[in-house]
Amino acid sequence: MTLEQLIRQFGKLPASQIAVQVNDTLAHHQSLIITAPPGAGKSTLLPLTLLKGMKTRGKILMLEPRRIAARQIAERMADMLGEKVGETVGYRVRFESKVSERTQIEVLTEGILTRMLVGDATLDGIDMVIFDEFHERSLQSDLAFALTRQTQLLIRDDLQLVIMLATINVEDISKAIQAPVIESKGKMYPVEVKYAQETPDRFHITQAIASAIVRAYREHDGDILAFLP
């Protein structure tokens, strides 16, 4: 599947609107920051379009903060290509690996990349490292980013670094790594805030959450996404 075919097939995803711009920008810059709200397709469509737009044969590593996310995103990308996970797209997390000699995109957790860098600071065979959900800061992610950036600056000036995160103020990050910023607008939905008539007891938060979900089911059709403390 070509870059153009990917964009056509998944054109409903907002990230498809910036796919060509992202590839064109990386043709002239070694680092790039991409901001996009949830649901834009940045974690699934953009890595595939980046792979199709690359002129070299090296791998893309994409870091996710959680193992479940790494597996699910790899499975989704493989499905988008009409393949099984472990072919063009695979993943590696603690105690589990689904990659093959054909794998060109590996979705990893930060700890896996850190161990790779300790074993081989050159990241031989890797052309691009993508830090997804960069706004979810942690000690592991900061260490992995620092080591990758050091490799890019001191050893591999051909290594490309892409940061993807939710739409927040990225000016400081952009200045620190001297990277341009591309924004995907995403889909905008109306938001209505409703407050409970009674303040729940802080020691019975589980009951309060259950009550809110039951109320939502009664008042609305469709699915529910609950953010839990």
Predicted feature locations:
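P-loop NTPase motor module signature
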Residues: 1-229
